[in-house]
Amino acid sequence: MSEPDPEPRHLSPRQAFDLLQEEPRAVLVDVRSNMEFLFVGHPVGAVHIPWIDEPDWEVNPHFVRQVRELMLGGVICDNDAGCAPVVLICRSGKRSTEAGRVLLQSGMREIYNVIDGFEGERDEDYHRSTLGGWRFEGLPWEQC
């Protein structure tokens, strides 16, 4: 029987923010589309590497390479400090979980997912940012 695919570690938005403040090597990667990143807003300091994007809405075939380049080839690991954390965020935590699985399968280690993402799930009126997420928690964000 095969082992289940590795899962990224899940953090609340506040836990992710705290990790990013405490660990200077940590990087926050926003995996949402260009439109979401630009027009909905994004966490301050996030690096944008889309997991799925327009025009075809297919998985970015260069995603792992782009994250590795961001992390200096994936070699930001040492015996004393371990590996630099990569924190992934999307709208509600689903795409970032998928992206995190792929990074783990590629051999990267310290991969985290922000549960509830930037906007969280929709409420009964189909509104976002009312139940959870980075914005709901009042964490720093900006809009282009």
Regions found by a protein language model. Give the residues of each.
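Rhodanese-like catalytic fold shared by cysteine-dependent sulfurtransferases
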Residues: 1-27, 34-85, 96-144
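Short, surface-exposed ligand- or partner-binding patches at beta-edge/loop junctions that are enriched
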Residues: 89
